[in-house]
């Protein structure tokens, strides 16, 4: 996977406008929907247990986000996930705040046990706590980077869960059971916008809907999103996170194949 291939995935999302079913948290629903629309995908947010299975089976991808979870929402996620699995729809999990409370951590693990996942996207602490590495710092749902080798963590998590792991942060690390890539795009202002990471997970879903290899889809999605964020930060350099948030939506709509080819920094890591 290189910048040129990532750029072509972006074009495929816009060409096919995949339906992304996001069972997400109530803090970020509007921002996520608008971000997917800006990108060129088609969002739907359906939460009721009575309809999630029917919605998931017609979607291009299903995204599960535990940011504001409840027993009922986790049940709905598992119902939707099983339906997606039955119909060949890729499922992406965002274990928001895993490690903050036992209920949150166990909810993420319950979903992983019950649903076959194409990818999991989170920060290092969320991924570490989801797979049982406990010596990482976390505060609420804003997880700290903790300590340790993030590349090794991504490898171990991918092998343990047999899925693509995307750990996002200052440097993004994407791994499957055999390969590891690092990505070097994005901007620090993303950490000042509530829901920027949650939107990114749904963007990964949109790319998984058009690219059958979830590793490549995650790389292309996170690279394209990171480039859009850099361009948005340039445009709002003398302003604050409010202006950046709006400009990020603008740039998700206008970022081009050429932008991604020029700006995306994708490196394959040699692992032993």
Swiss-Prot record:
Q: Which GO terms describe its molecular function?
A: ATP binding; hydroxyethylthiazole kinase activity; magnesium ion binding
Under Enzyme Commission nomenclature, its number is 2.7.1.50
Cofactor details (free text): Binds 2 magnesium ions per subunit. The first is coordinated via water, the second is coordinated to ATP but its significance is unclear.
Matching Gene3D superfamilies, A to Z? 3.40.1190.20
Catalysis performed (reactions): 5-(2-hydroxyethyl)-4-methylthiazole + ATP = 4-methyl-5-(2-phosphooxyethyl)-thiazole + ADP + H(+)
Pathway given in the UniProt record = Cofactor biosynthesis; thiamine diphosphate biosynthesis; 4-methyl-5-(2-phosphoethyl)-thiazole from 5-(2-hydroxyethyl)-4-methylthiazole: step 1/1
Residues that hold substrate according to the record: 45, 195
Q: Which cofactor does it need?
A: Mg(2+)
Source domain of life:
Bacteria
Alphabetized, the UniProt keywords read: ATP-binding, Kinase, Magnesium, Metal-binding, Nucleotide-binding, Thiamine biosynthesis, Transferase
Function text: Catalyzes the phosphorylation of the hydroxyl group of 4-methyl-5-beta-hydroxyethylthiazole (THZ).
Instruction: Give the family from UniProt.
Output: Belongs to the Thz kinase family.
**What name has this protein been given in UniProt?**
Hydroxyethylthiazole kinase
Q: Which organism is it from?
A: Bacillus subtilis (strain 168)
What gene does the UniProt entry assign to this protein? thiM
């Amino acid at each position: 996977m290189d910048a040129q291939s990532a750029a072509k995935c972006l074009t495929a999302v816009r060409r096919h406008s995949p339906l992304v079913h996001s069972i997400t948290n109530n803090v970020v629903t509007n921002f996520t929907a608008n971000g997917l629309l800006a990108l060129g995908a088609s969002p739907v947010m359906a939460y009721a247990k009575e309809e999630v299975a029917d919605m998931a089976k017609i979607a291009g991808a299903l995204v599960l986000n535990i940011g504001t979870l409840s027993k009922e929402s986790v049940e709905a996620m598992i119902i939707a996930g099983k339906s997606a699995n039955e119909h060949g729809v890729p499922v992406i999990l965002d274990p928001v705040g895993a490690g903050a409370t036992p209920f949150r951590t166990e909810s993420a693990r319950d979903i992983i046990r019950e649903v076959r996942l194409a990818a999991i996207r989170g920060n290092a602490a969320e991924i570490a706590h989801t797979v049982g590495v406990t010596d990482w710092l976390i505060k609420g749902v804003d997880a700290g980077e903790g300590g340790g080798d993030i590349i090794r963590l991504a490898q171990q998590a991918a092998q343990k869960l047999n899925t693509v792991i995307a750990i996002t942060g200052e440097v993004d690390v994407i791994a499957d059971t055999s390969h590891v890539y690092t990505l070097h795009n994005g901007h620090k202002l993303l950490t000042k916008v509530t829901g920027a990471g949650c939107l990114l997970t749904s963007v990964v879903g949109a790319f998984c809907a058009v690219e059958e290899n979830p590793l490549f889809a995650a790389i292309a999605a996170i690279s394209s999103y990171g480039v859009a964020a850099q361009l948005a930060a340039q445009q709002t350099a003398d302003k604050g996170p409010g202006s950046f948030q709006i400009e990020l939506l603008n740039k998700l709509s206008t970022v081009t194949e050429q932008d991604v080819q020029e700006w995306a920094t994708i490196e394959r890591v040699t692992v032993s």
